[in-house]
Amino acid sequence: MKQKLEDYFERCGGKGWMHIERLLVPEELGSHVKMYAKVTIDPHSSLGYHEHHGDGESYYMLEGEAIYQDNETKRTLKPGDVTFTADGKGHGIENPGDTPLVFMALIINND
């Protein structure tokens, strides 16, 4: 298991910085999982709205409070909340707070 940390600025049209710690490498994930990672979004930053094609994504919230856009609907997420964005659908997430937003992200490939 080789963990890899990636830093992104204004990812998918968002604002500020986010950090993705990939917990498993592709060889460990197999063909069904595209990404399993711990994601941190800096205070007052966001991951912009984007659509999924050929895969779906789930978030499990760990720390902080988020504004989550699920297609056309926005809602607040707190630790313990889970989301799922299906193939062909879109989402984005914003950290409006003064502390980092931390969540697990799992991207599952369609077969």
Protein language model regions, located:
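Short acidic-glycine-tyrosine-enriched beta hairpin
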Residues: T73-D87
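Conserved short histidine dyad/triad with adjacent acidic residue
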Residues: R22-V25, A37-H53
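Ligand-binding loop in jelly-roll beta-barrel domains
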Residues: I67, D87-D111
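Short, surface-exposed secondary-structure edge patches
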Residues: K38, S58, E72-T76
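Short, conserved beta-strand element in jelly-roll/cupin
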Residues: T40-D42, E51-Y68
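A short, N-terminal "cap"/entry segment at the start of jelly-roll beta-barrel domains
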Residues: M1-V33, G48
